[in-house]
Structures are given as C-alpha cells and as structure tokens.
A protein has these predicted regions:
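Catalytic-domain carbohydrate-binding cleft regions of carbohydrate-active enzymes
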Residues: 1-253
Length: 253
C-alpha cells in the first residue's frame, strides 16, 4: 500500500514494534492478538524490492521467515512482561518453528466454494504434519461476494446456496483446532441466518453447542500438544502407517 514495512529481523525494530502494541493495545487489556498480513502483504511489488537489505540479509533471502520473527517478537515481549497471561496469536502466515510462539495460523482469504472447502481438509493435515498443530480456516470461506449476485438472487445471508456451504463449513470447524467464523462480502452472525426453529439457524447453533461440549477434550488435547508434541488433526497414516491406503488420504482424519 505504499508503506514500507519494518525490519522484524532486527531486535531493535522488534522492540519498537512491541512498544506500540504494548501501549496502544496490551496495556489496555486484551486476551489475544490477531496479526493479519504477516507475509507481509505486498501490493504491486517490483523485483528490486526483494533485494532490499534487512538485518539478516536481503529480503529475498529471508522473506519466508517474516512471520516467524514478527510473531516471535510479540510473543517474547509479552512473556517477558508478564507470565500471567498465555500468548495466543492468530496470524495469516507461518514458518517452521512458529508453534513455540503460541501462534494459530489460518489458511488466508480463501474463496467461498465447495472446491475450496474440500481443500481445507488437506491443507489442515499438511500444515499439522509440519509440526505446527494450531490451524484454522474462515468458516464459509472469506470471499463470498458471488453469492450476493450471480449465484442466486438477493444477498448471501438469504441465499440457500451459501447457507448450505456455511453450515457444512461450520460443522467441519467444530473438529478443527480453532473454530472461527470470518469473511468478507457477507456477515456471519448466526442471527442473520434465521431464527430458532429454522433449519439453517438451528444447524449453526447445534454446531456451536457441540464445539462447547468438546471443550474438556480440546483442553486436554491442548496439553498433549504442548507437553508431548502431539497434534489436533492427525492424518490417518500417523496412526495406521502400515496401511498404504492411508498414505494419500486427504479427505478424513
């Protein structure tokens, strides 16, 4: 957007970044961070942009680690300031080892379609296999604008085609490390999708209630993840390695 990003590879830059976050947000009281665009988002880049020098070398050579050092800087500073609040950072990008900073990575601004929904299962499994257990997806997809016009009359909140996709994605989200509804083009508040006694509303409420009923299990699994290097989403071959049929199975876990 014409704004030069900071150099997160430099410890002094991370200090400055944290000072702004601490004074403007953390000291006011908050439960967790939502750090978007940690790729970083880069509009209309020129090839020469990637040759700019950072504290650790050219941006081209270290750019993939941008989310690691950015998220790590916030996590380290918060933990140095207080141990009374666990670090949780929702972020759009990841790098190997980032799990140690309490980060939860989502699949980004994906389209609202059945094909993209199908791909989320594979994405979650592959991501978990890298050693990063905390993963999630925008329920219903992010870009839902097509359901406001070309794929049916009216708005997405009134469009049966989006209703079905949103409900099924929400039901999948129940069994993900984090269940989180978010997106553009269509609001996601469940009260906009009907009322008690109506199928879409009731299905969304049932999914949310089921998620809450699983909290003891999720909390116990979180302990296993943290202390025994476990994971939430387990590809079938992790438990049935001797069965070749599980090796390329990306539709269940």
């Amino acid at each position: 957007s014409g704004v030069k990003v900071y150099d997160p590879y430099h410890p002094k830059a991370r200090d400055i970044y944290w000072n702004y976050l601490n004074k403007g947000i953390f000291q006011l009281g908050m439960d967790g961070w939502w750090m978007d665009s940690t790729e970083p988002d880069h509009f209309n880049p020129k090839d020469s942009d990637f040759d700019r020098q950072t504290y650790s070398g050219s941006f081209r050579s270290v750019r993939n680690a941008f989310p690691l050092v950015t998220v790590g800087g916030v996590s380290d500073h918060q933990r140095a300031l207080t141990r009374d609040k666990r670090v949780i950072i929702l972020t759009r990008s990841g790098f190997l080892g980032q799990q140690r900073y309490g980060s939860n990575v989502w699949t980004g601004d994906v389209g609202s379609s059945w094909d993209m929904f199908r791909r989320q299962i594979t994405a979650g499994l592959n991501f978990s296999l890298t050693g990063m257990p905390h993963w999630n997806t925008d329920l219903g997809g992010f870009f839902a604008g097509s359901y406001n016009n070309s794929l049916g009359g009216g708005t997405a909140t009134k469009n049966p085609m989006f209703h079905e996709l949103y409900v099924r994605w929400a039901q999948f989200g129940v069994f993900c490390p984090m269940m989180r509804s978010h997106g553009a083009d269509a609001p996601r508040e469940i009260f906009l999708y009907g009322k008690a006694g109506e199928p879409v509303y009731d299905a969304l409420v049932d999914a949310i209630k089921l998620r809450y009923s699983l909290m003891p299990y999720i909390y116990s699994t979180s302990w296993e993840v943290s202390h025994r290097n476990s994971t939430f989403m387990r590809a079938l071959f992790m438990d049935f390695l001797s069965d070749p049929k599980t090796w390329n199975m990306g539709s269940e876990y």
